[in-house]
């Protein structure tokens, strides 16, 4: 059951990415009609370069934006030993361990691959969770590392950036350029305008969908590592019950945290990078029946 869930989640992510890439290519070719293919290729290269910078420096940026401080075993033996035991269990390299001095209970993982991984927990999380719950949360974060989720999110980020740049350039060309050249009928003009307005919104929704799928996958991977899904389910319930905004908020890294760090409200639900906590807990309890 658990292995089939993990396999299904990976397939879902692949299908979303595959359709997204095809859609981006189609939109790009349509945009090339107005921008010219050389300019279109320039925008793609620019977006790819931006994504590469994010890929190689995302770990450092996340640490800086969160205000996390690197620790050793002596600084917090409980957190360090938990991560070390999970590293041994999963066969992954020992990641750098950080603590964020913030009363909001939360945790995140970052790094482009297991060799460059970083995991962090807030002081608030360490205060409210017992040892088994802490292990469940950190197993979830190590699951992100094991599943190369930072790499997946970087690919999606690059595609979203490309769509945004292309859309912006197309809209500028439609508004200020001469679009009455041969072949650019009023109908094609309207079609390109429609997709230029719609594409960034659709791209963002795809990004959110991928993020939610990866959260489910990390939950399942973490549960499989500890063989105790109930601990992670209990931790998620505590995180939801004690949720509060982080002192240093950044929407650009909201998807990294195990629990949505943004303030509650209608738009948080609509554009959430995380699936509903109730559904995550339900799935974990269902997995628990397999042990």
From Swiss-Prot:
Which residue ranges does UniProt annotate as crossing the membrane? Answer: 11-31, 34-54, 155-175, 186-206
- Coiled-coil annotation reads none
One function term, GO molecular function aspect: metalloendopeptidase activity
Q: How is the cofactor bound?
A: Binds 1 zinc ion per subunit.
Instruction: Tell me what topology the record assigns in the membrane.
Output: Multi-pass membrane protein
GO biological process: any one?
A: proteolysis
Q: Which Gene3D superfamilies does the entry link to? A: Metalloproteases ('zincins'), catalytic domain
Transmembrane listed as a keyword: yes
Known EC number: 3.4.24.-
The residues that hold Zn(2+) are 140, 144, 215
- Cofactor(s) essential for the protein: Zn(2+)
Q: Which InterPro entries does its entry note? A: HtpX_protease, Pept_M48_protease_HtpX, Peptidase_M48
Where does the record place the catalytic residues? 141
Q: Does the keyword Hydrolase apply?
A: yes
Q: Name one GO cellular component term.
A: plasma membrane
Compartment list: Cell membrane
- Provide this UniProt record's keywords sorted from A to Z: Cell membrane, Hydrolase, Membrane, Metal-binding, Metalloprotease, Protease, Transmembrane, Transmembrane helix, Zinc
The UniProt family comment states:
Belongs to the peptidase M48B family.
Question: What is the recorded name of this protein?
Answer: Protease HtpX homolog
Which species is this UniProt entry from?
A: Tropheryma whipplei (strain TW08/27) (Whipple's bacillus)
Phylogenetic classification of the source organism? Bacteria, Bacillati, Actinomycetota, Actinomycetes, Micrococcales
